[in-house]
Amino acid sequence: MGKIIGIDLGTTNSCVAIMEHGKPVVIQNSEGGRTTPSIVAYTNKGERLVGQVAKNQMVTNPENTIYSIKRFMGRRFEEVASEIKMVPYKVEKGQNGDARVNISNIKKQMSPPEISAATLTKMKETAEAYLGEKVTEAVITVPAYFNDAQRQATKDAGKIAGLDVKRIVNEPTAAALAYGIEKKHEEIVAVYDLGGGTFDISILELGDGVFEVKSTNGDTHLGGDNFDDEIIKYLITEFKKDSAIDLSNDKMALQRLKEAAEKAKIELSGAQEASINLPFITADANGPKHLQYTLTRAKFEQMVDHLVQKTKEPCLKAIKDAGLKASDINEVILVGGSTRIPAIQKIVKEIFGQEPNKGVNPDEAVAIGAAIQGGILTGEAKDMVLLDVTPLSLGIETLGGVMTKLIERNTTIPTKKSQVFSTAADNQTSVDIKVLQGEREMASQNRVLGNFILDGIPAAPRGVPQIEVSFDIDANGIVHVSAKDMGTGKEQKIRIESSSGLSEEEIERMVKDAESHAEEDKKLKEGIEAKNIANSLIYQTEKSLKEYGEKITNQDKEAIENKIKELKDTLEGSDISLLKSKTEELQQASYKIAEMMYKDAQASSPAQNNAQNNAGSESKEADYEVVDEDKK
């Protein structure tokens, strides 16, 4: 088995790590960063940018720069109304009801897994550059509170990126692996994970290489983006008061506000106030307008207090579900960049009655844990066992629209559970099995993961047929369901794929698109390198012509000048093979100058060469004499 990389596919940033000599190592990207912005952009020429280069052009290209796409993974269009308001790009309803992004620069509607695949490809290439070998397998992390559709969408993204996703791991669990890799004694830890777009809390029992999740809870609509949004709303309101101009419909201004809000939030973690200066934010009949405000930490904490408080209830539920009291927890580990906010650290202390542990890097812990899980799968990380749980209950709809649960939330996975049901009407020959996920009593109030029909049931009075429904959750938290008529032995099975998810055909098409993008990227890089070589050669040849042009024949000089002109003309076009050919022609022609330079250098210093030769002979003789003297 080859190397399995660990990837933290984050809302704001992503990170990749690998096990080396039994220890996890975070890999730097080509820009030198240990994390990579989870941002994908398309330029007006249709070129795809990923990571920092995409982030650098966000302000000037807001409608074609996609960030926080994780908030849309595995979600139906009607589920993302609040998320749509937070982004400048266009989110539409896909043919199968899922949320898709319309990218005007390439005139294409793209699915969230397809966009996330671009970030995963960047992570894959980062690892390949470091290892010097091809990478095909990965462990990818997801928020613990991701439902089945969101997990499936993440696996699909990996497949599109050319990765065989060996395991989907919950982010808090991965962070606990990073924390506990060298811990030998038993302890109970809480992982409080507040990232860019999601919040998770998990309670784990660690000891003797076993990492057992006792409970998990969270909110997939809460993260650092929401904190930024509060600052943006404040700035829009204040600016409207002062200048009577509403910035809320100006996409370029909103993008600048987003950057400024994120920067101010980060500054306020270490300072009591942050200055926000955005010159030329807009203009009216009187000329340009500048935005300038000072935001204090106290004001910021007041603005975001309702968000901070929203993390409290999931924590209390997780503690209760684990059958524990807050005082039973030995350590509280903070994960995710947003846990640097002082108000968050304060509420953590309030909930758990202790100072949180800050010994784990909140930006890297999840990727490190994913790499460790990869090591467990390859056998490189020995004597370690990970026991995770399903975050939400699973069941089916039964008579009266009730949800009958087969697997309760916080059940250790993998797991399998079966229950026998019967028909609801006389002579019923088929049953529609509707698979649900959630905690509400009524089926309509929970998420429908999928449905299938078991037919061919012999006609009989209601209540007579025996239909066994089995739920099987694998180690990735992905659900498989089967229904079997006990009388005939007839069985129907499905692996749950969200009704708004991607079909196999779509995934295959996206895999091919991703591969063609890789080829395009390769050609683009080859073209840039060829142009750089050509420009460098033109510069050097022109410089040499100025110095030595008088010393070569007019015929040679004219030939070189013609070749320079031809190469400059070729640089204007896009034919790379012609460019390489013209570069080679100029290289050959310019050898005439090199010959003249060499002859000139030799002719100018014969005396110096003779002096050096004589000095060389004398020193050799002297060396001989010293050695000879020693022998006496």
Swiss-Prot record:
Belongs to the heat shock protein 70 family. Residues 601-632 are annotated as: Disordered. It comes from the Bacteria. One of its GO terms (molecular function) is ATP binding. InterPro entries: ATPase_NBD (IPR043129), Chaperone_DnaK (IPR012725), Heat_shock_70_CS (IPR018181), HSP70_C_sf (IPR029048), HSP70_peptide-bd_sf (IPR029047), Hsp_70_fam (IPR013126). The modification Phosphothreonine is found at residue 198. The keyword Nucleotide-binding applies. This is Chaperone protein DnaK. Residues 618-632 have a biased composition (Basic and acidic residues). Residues 601-617 have a biased composition (Low complexity). NCBIfam families: PRK00290.1, PRK05183.1, prok_dnaK. Acts as a chaperone. Induction: By stress conditions e.g. heat shock. Keywords: ATP-binding, Chaperone, Nucleotide-binding, Phosphoprotein, Stress response.
